Design a protein with these regions (language model features):
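Hydrophobic transmembrane alpha-helices of multi-pass small-molecule transporters
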Residues: 1-107, 114, 242, 247-381, ...
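Membrane-interfacial helix-loop connectors
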Residues: 60-95, 144-211, 228-249, 356, ...
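Hydrophobic residues within the alpha-helical transmembrane core of Major Facilitator Superfamily
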Residues: 75, 139-143, 214, 218, ...
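Transmembrane-helix boundary/entry motifs in multi-pass membrane transporters
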Residues: 93, 125-133, 202, 295-299
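Transmembrane alpha-helical segments of multi-pass membrane transport proteins and ion-pumping complexes
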Residues: 102, 106-114, 118, 130-133, ...
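Membrane interface segments of multi-pass transport proteins and intramembrane proteases
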Residues: 119-130, 346-351, 386-389
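Short hydrophobic alpha-helices at membrane interfaces in multi-pass membrane enzymes
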Residues: 134-138, 206-209, 309-310
Length: 503
């Protein structure tokens, strides 16, 4: 009985992983009990332990989806009294826009995948230089993220990459492009040539996706709509779209230029896992797919593309003008696309929600860990230290502190805590309005730029790590950290220098 229960626990995860999670769950309450009995603040120490344990589950996302082990740790935190359901609900309410975005916008993008795949296939076949293609992915992702939203753009990138992978898999399994039932996660049907090319193709897709997702961070920091915390900071500071962009520009423009130079350099010199080219044999598959699409094109399929294009234009305008919360716009996209494309059966709609809902559940679990950080004031000593510094040094220190904390927790949460702290300091006349503006800029850039160091720093990175694409292209937590490392180093240094010079 116990053996069967152990086998079922966390499914087919390795035994050492299961044992580690069990050890966490046993050690946490014992540690809390012992430290409290010594008259020390056990909740603070165990709170940090739970944060690090949750990061561990994210780091090993390919061994076991983090929802289950991370969820068990979060449930234990509730039972140990490190937080409570009301604090968790408060965090969920605070981040409801992000949750709506994941539920509806990602599903909306699913119904636009034909248009996305057509556009990106043309780009893949038109741009012959891998370096130019990488720069294009990075630039377009940055541009779109500045006016749309980093998570939305990441959803597009994932949809496109999965589409590319499916085309490759169909061709190398000897199947027609029209086959809809093929399981592209099963490599047993691949030809010998396909197996040889598979790793090269995975590496090529990893390159493009990582350039693209870093691009979302480069663009996302620039405007109010780019990242959820930007809107929060702008609301507290009372900045409109243009004012926000102008205030951030002295930091964000040099960082963006440095990002594009970094993209060029790592592709040119084939470092940090980049510089993987698309073999000619694989490129020919996409030429064949393009020819197939043209040959199969009918008035109805062309009309579908036009509908997707018009709804895409509506999406861009609605997001750029912030006509509603991103998730509500996403729901509008679903309704428009499914209505005019005639997708009215429930099971056809259900497929669109499969990608995002597991991650949405994981994000809610993450908010449980965030509520532990808030209730146990895990970051308070750092905040107190920063606010105690000389005014001229506060902005650079805020930039660094925000970056470090965002990388290990979540940039939305860190930005929320810091912006509220400096708003309280402004209201109490501890700092001037000019100093408040400088610190708000440092908080925004600090939470957005260095947080690319780890996947848990940015929601877009975490979404990519836990998506169905990550295991397909062997994109693990540590591989993401290593591939993001040149960007992390260069952008953090350039951002820090820009903060020191301009603030």
């Amino acid at each position: 009985m116990i053996n069967n229960l152990y086998k079922m626990f966390l499914g087919d995860s390795p035994n050492w992983y299961k044992n580690t999670i069990i050890a966490f769950l046993v050690i946490n309450p014992i540690t809390l009990l012992i430290i409290n009995s010594m008259g020390l603040n056990g909740s603070f120490i165990v709170g940090w332990m739970i944060l690090l344990e949750f990061i561990f589950t994210l780091a090993l996302a390919l061994k076991c989806y983090p929802l289950q082990p991370g969820g068990l740790i979060a449930i234990q935190a509730l039972f140990l009294g490190l937080t409570n359901p009301y604090s968790l609900l408060h965090e969920i309410e605070h981040n409801i826009e992000v949750i709506l975005l994941l539920v509806f916008m990602v599903a909306g993008i699913y119904f636009m995948k034909n248009l996305m795949l057509t556009i990106f296939t043309k780009l893949l076949l038109t741009i012959h230089s891998k370096t130019k293609l990488s720069l294009m992915f990075c630039f377009v992702s940055a541009f779109l993220s500045a006016f749309l939203d980093a998570l939305t753009v990441t959803a597009v990138l994932i949809a496109v990459a999965v589409g590319f992978y499916r085309i490759f898999h169909l061709a190398n399994s000897g199947l027609a492009f029209s086959t809809s039932t093929h399981d592209y996660q099963d490599d047993s049907s691949l030809s010998e040539a396909g197996i040889e090319d598979l790793e090269n193709f995975k590496a090529f897709l990893r390159d493009l996706i990582m350039h693209g997702v870093v691009g979302t961070a480069l663009g996302g920091v620039c405007t109010i709509v780019g990242e959820p915390q930007n809107l929060l900071i702008a609301n507290v500071a009372g900045w409109e779209f243009i004012e926000f962009m102008i205030k951030m520009a002295p930091i964000t423009v040099p960082v963006f230029i440095a990002g594009m130079i970094t993209c060029f350099a790592i592709e040119k010199f084939h470092i940090f896992g980049f510089g993987n080219h698309l073999p000619l044999r694989i490129k020919n598959i996409f030429h064949e797919f393009n020819d197939y699409e043209i040959a199969q094109s009918t008035d109805e399929s062309r009309l579908e593309l036009y509908i997707e294009m018009l709804v895409g234009i509506f999406l861009i305008i609605a997001l750029a003008l912030h006509l509603a919360a991103v998730g509500i716009i996403g729901l509008g996209v679903i309704i428009l696309l499914t209505s005019f494309k005639g997708i009215t059966h429930e099971h056809d709609l259900g497929d669109a929600f499969k990608e995002a809902l597991p991650f949405t559940a994981l994000l809610v679990v993450f908010f449980g860990v965030v509520s532990v950080i808030a209730d146990q004031q895990l970051f308070t000593p750092i905040i107190t230290f920063v606010l105690a510094q000389d005014a001229s040094n506060q902005a650079p220190i805020f930039f660094v502190a925000n970056g470090v904390l965002s990388a290990i927790s979540d940039n939305v949460f860190v930005a929320t805590i810091y912006i509220n702290e400096i708003k309280d300091a402004l209201d109490l006349n501890i700092i001037s309005r000019d100093q408040f503006d400088k610190l708000a800029i440092a908080i925004n850039t600090g939470t957005n730029i260095p947080s690319i160091a780890t996947p848990n720093g940015q929601a877009a990175f975490l979404f990519l790590l836990t998506s169905s694409l990550a295991p397909l292209i062997n994109l693990s937590y540590m591989r993401m950290v290593i591939m993001a490392l040149p960007y992390t180093i260069v952008l953090s240094i350039v951002g820090f220098i820009a903060v020191v010079i301009n603030l």
